[in-house]
A protein has these predicted regions:
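The feature captures the beta-strand-to-loop junction immediately N-terminal to the Walker
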Residues: 33-35
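Catalytic Walker B motif of ABC-type/P-loop ATPase nucleotide-binding domains
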Residues: 154-158
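ABC ATPase NBD coupling module
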Residues: 64-78, 101, 223-224
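Conserved ABC ATPase "signature" region
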Residues: 107-125, 176-177
Length: 236
């Protein structure tokens, strides 16, 4: 579904991300780990085509991103951030906002909102305003808002790092259940290797702006690709 080859992304004149080769299969959940500032978020921005490489490229369904119409491509993806970024309106209107911009009929939009508000456990909150939500509730709304768009590719940038550990664990459990049933291609950035191992089909390790290793979680722990990966694992 996604192929990355000889990718080089620069920001402010410096190398921000280097990826020699990476294949992401349809329906796969890839967890991305690495130190702060390593280039994890840059990978998501490149996949969203919000920043463009200076060399190499990314293909989506065999077609280079540079050849996709930006509007057409962005209809196929959804982004979930650490900050839910909810608007000052009801939960229902927040979830449906993207559908409104896409011209989805009200009946279809309502059906989708109900489906995903149930899946994310916020159906009882639909009439509540965003400012009245807890951190965990707000992030559940953010997830529902992403899924309601029916994206082919879901990009998640440390979406649960701002909530308490108990809420985080429950959110991950619920999201894992949804993805197990939904089989949606997902790239999930996290600092937590244990979390990555539970959530991801594979784990990608980015260190010093370079993709160092992509493997099954247990293989990375026992067979780090080089000393930088080994040192990163030892610091966790």
């Amino acid at each position: 579904m996604i192929s990355i080859n000889n990718l080089l992304v620069q920001r402010n004149g410096r190398d921000a991300l280097k990826v020699a080769s990476l294949e992401i299969q349809k329906g796969e959940t890839l967890a991305v780990v690495g130190p702060n500032g390593a280039g994890k978020s840059t990978l998501l921005l490149a996949l969203a085509h919000l920043i463009k490489p200076v060399d190499g490229g990314i293909t989506f369904h065999g077609k280079p991103l540079k050849d996709w119409d930006d509007i057409e491509y962005r209809r196929k993806i959804a982004f979930v951030f650490q900050d839910p970024l909810l608007m000052d309106m009801s939960v229902r209107d927040n979830i449906a906002l993207g559908l409104k911009f896409r011209g989805v009929k009200k009946e279809d939009a309502l059906e989708r909102v109900i489906k995903w508000s149930k899946a994310m456990g916020v159906e009882s909150l639909l009439k509540r305003r965003a400012g009245q939500l807890s951190g965990g509730e707000a992030q559940r709304v953010s997830l529902a808002r992403a899924f309601v768009l029916d994206p082919e590719l879901l990009l998640m940038d440390e979406p649960f790092s701002a909530v308490d550990p108990q809420t985080r664990a429950q959110l991950l459990k619920d999201l894992s259940k949804v993805l197990a049933e939904d089989h949606r291609t997902t790239i999930f950035v996290t600092h937590n290797l244990k979390e990555a191992g539970k959530f991801g089909d594979r784990v990608a390790v980015i260190i010093n702006s370079e993709l160092k290793q992509v493997d099954m979680p247990e293989h990375i722990k026992t067979n780090p690709a080089d000393e930088s990966v080994k040192a990163f694992l030892e610091e966790l």
